[in-house]
């Protein structure tokens, strides 16, 4: 469905909750973001239990309009730790951490350099039993093959369905088809995918979000 079609829908004829009941179980799981402390009347987020780690520090070749490396500033800096990823995870676990997100800045192809840390992730999984999720950008075939050996809890994957957003916001020489290729690649290797669609990513405008949804629905999640 095109974004413009939203305005033509007669929502008085639609029962959203009935549609939800027909397609999903009664239990809903909510996740609180872990990059910044937050608290509501019903929920208090903890930065200690699930920790984000940047394997590149605050360095990112894309330096895109989405975050201008600011997201990396809220992550633990692995290069500054001057140790291996396993050692950092073990130290975190000793202080109460249950899981980690392995992320970092991208190269010009929007790929986070995860391959040097695959063996450490395997050890974290097998020896420490911690939850491991990764944010890989647009991983190539070799990276997906390696990630499949880690037994990950999930891959956080931004899905973009609009060419202008990819070019103007991410400064990336890629197409929406490249994002679908990565979805196919991860599914083929049996890696659980947690797709993200960022509403208004094109400077606050809705561009390609429906296309991203249509892309995602082709694959089992």
Where are these regions (language model features)?
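Structured catalytic core of nucleotide-sugar glycosyltransferases
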Residues: 32-33, 53, 69, 86, ...
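Helix C-cap/helix->beta junction micro-motif
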Residues: 23-24, 128, 189, 219
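Conserved strand-turn element in the central/C-terminal portion of the radical SAM core barrel
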Residues: 182-208
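N-terminal [4Fe-4S]-dependent radical SAM core
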Residues: 3-61, 65-76
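Active-site glycine- and acidic-residue-rich loops that bind
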Residues: 135-138, 171-175, 198-214
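Core AdoMet radical
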Residues: 70-84, 88, 92-116, 124-143, ...
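Hydrophobic positions in alpha-helices of CheY-like receiver
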Residues: 120-124, 186
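A glycine-rich, aromatic-flanked flexible loop/lid motif
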Residues: 14, 219-221
